[in-house]
Amino acid sequence: MKVENQIENYIVKLTKTLKDLNVKDIEQCSSVLLDAYENKKNIFICGNGGSASTASHFACDINKGVSYGLDKRFKIIPLTDNLATISAYSNDVNYDFIFLEQIKNFYNPGDVLIGISGSGNSMNVLKAIEFVNENEGVTIGWTGFKGGKLKEVSQFSINANIDDMQISEDIHMTLVHLMMKVLRKKLTGSEDYI
């Protein structure tokens, strides 16, 4: 296959996956985030690898891109950014517990957890989701492929239904920017930010 054809095929698959997203699912997730904002709840977010980068990016864009200039602020806490804590739990306990044990330090009933997993089967994400489900919280899963277990156990989910990890991750990054614009518009009347 020529490189040009490979590029065209990627763009076609990405565009189709975007068009196939369930808008109602996205709207529900943005409503959950607005409710958390209105009720001053924490919003935790986690993922591994590329999904960890997406989690950090989401926290930045909402904490700064949406909250800037508002009297009341979003409380987005990425569970992916404290390398010392992550490595301590990985080394001393088990990698499966890196998000669960962090969330226990800050969690209050009614808080929200967004778990991102391309496969939908990342055990450390699932353990944190299960904890929040069992403790009167709200869970959102962002998945790829068929959604895996994360799609099943999350109260709300957005699934990039494609058997391609990179396109799944592209969709999740698009969700970050889409959510930022939706939330910013809802709270300020404008999508613009500094």
Predicted regions and their residues:
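Generic N-terminal amphipathic, Lys/Arg-enriched alpha-helix
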Residues: M1-L21
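Hydrophobic packing residues in well-ordered alpha-helices of helical domains and bundles
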Residues: I7, I26-C29, A55
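Structured helix-beta-strand junction loops
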Residues: T17, N39-K40, V153
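A short, well-structured juxtamembrane/interface segment
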Residues: L21-N39
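Glycine-rich phosphate/diphosphate-binding loops and the adjacent beta-loop-alpha structural elements
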Residues: K41-N42, S51
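Hydrophobic beta-strand scaffold residues
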Residues: I43-F44, T139
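Glycine-rich phosphate-binding loops that contact phosphosugars or nucleotide phosphates
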Residues: S51-Y193
